[in-house]
Amino acid sequence: MISYYFQGFALGAAMILPLGPQNAFVMNQGIRRQYHLMIALLCALSDLVLISAGIFGGSALLMQSPWLLALVTWGGVAFLLWYGFGALKTAMSSNLELASAEVMKQGRWKIIATMLAVTWLNPHVYLDTFVVLGSLGGQLAMEPKRWFALGTISASFLWFFGLALLAAWLAPRLRTVKAQRIINILVGVVMWLIAFQLAREGVAHMHALFN
């Protein structure tokens, strides 16, 4: 059964490594050393719920609800555009230290709300967990399925805590004005590129719904 665990771990790691909204947010919180371990835990727990739902049967709900998928897609587009705009606005600020200080004033609940939006309004999360993991893990018998799910969940926990701790460790080097400007520009551009990609997918979904 351990082979199914490592299959799940490898697949989970492959899907979670690319830079996306979730990883960018965890990295930024780590650099700020602001609730970064709590955010890592909440991201990992969110993945636990999504992975379990996808592998143990939740994928059918998403595939049978095209309107739900369209709603999540356009909600994700709106959020990513807003999040990317905020990052670019901070990067282009004439007084980046002041802008960063304003961001640091965000309360715990606002940070948690942003994390939940970053995770749950990203349609790619549902495609990864419900479609990819659901189609692969769903074909297994119950015992191998549990080991497969445990492997993917382990990869998520290891990655988010590792990313948060590494970013916090590198914070003295990454909190310089130049580094923060580069990071915010990178995050903003990536968020807008993902939003553009989601918008194209959203248009395709809407076209399919009305034709």
Swiss-Prot record:
Membrane topology: Multi-pass membrane protein
Membrane spanning stretches: 1-21, 37-57, 68-88, 111-131, 147-167, 179-199
Similarity comment: family membership: Belongs to the LysE/ArgO transporter (TC 2.A.75) family.
Native source organism of the sequence: Salmonella paratyphi C (strain RKS4594)
Keyword Transmembrane helix: yes
GO MF term set: L-arginine transmembrane transporter activity
NCBIfam families attached to this UniProt entry: 2a75, PRK09304.1
GO CC terms of this entry: plasma membrane
Entry's localization field: Cell inner membrane
Coiled-coil ranges from the UniProt annotation: none
Protein name from the UniProt record: Arginine exporter protein ArgO
Statement: the UniProt record of this protein carries the keyword Cell membrane: yes
Known catalytic reactions: L-arginine(in) = L-arginine(out)
InterPro entries xrefs: Arg_export_ArgO_enterobac (IPR023445), LeuE-type (IPR001123), Lys/arg_exporter (IPR004777)
Annotated keywords: Amino-acid transport, Cell inner membrane, Cell membrane, Membrane, Transmembrane, Transmembrane helix, Transport
Disulfide bonds: none
Chain's role: Involved in the export of arginine. Important to control the intracellular level of arginine and the correct balance between arginine and lysine.
One Pfam family named in its UniProt record: LysE
